[in-house]
């Protein structure tokens, strides 16, 4: 199996761990990063971000986070539309990463992006 990474590349970080990994990986790939999370603490000033709101729930379930991610679909599509390749970084043991990764991957594939996750 071969995979070609086409420029421009977007590194997407999902949740807490994914956001940290994406910020570092974007430096390595000399690309932009996008942080998608339901926790505002995961955002930094260097990256574009999409806040997936799960308010007013304090401890949201995986299902709620996934549903809220689907509600943010148009904003996510706008962010990925300008890139050819997308690298998705997420901690699948965490709620945010496990909830968001399938949704984000599907959006990127529907937009005909080369996806590594």
Which ranges hold each PLM region?
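Tubulin/FtsZ superfamily GTPase core signature
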Residues: 1-117
């Amino acid at each position: 199996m071969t995979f070609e990474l086409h420029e421009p590349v977007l590194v997407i970080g999902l949740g807490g761990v994914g956001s940290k990994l994406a910020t570092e990986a974007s430096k390595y790939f000399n690309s932009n990063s996008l942080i998608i999370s339901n926790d505002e603490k995961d955002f930094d000033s260097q990256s574009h971000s999409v806040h997936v709101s799960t308010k007013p729930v304090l401890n949201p379930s995986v299902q709620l986070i996934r549903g809220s991610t689907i509600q943010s679909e148009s904003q996510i599509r706008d962010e990925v539309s300008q890139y050819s390749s997308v690298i998705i970084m997420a901690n699948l043991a965490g709620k945010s990463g496990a909830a968001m990764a399938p949704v984000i991957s599907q959006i990127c594939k529907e937009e005909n992006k080369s996806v590594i996750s």
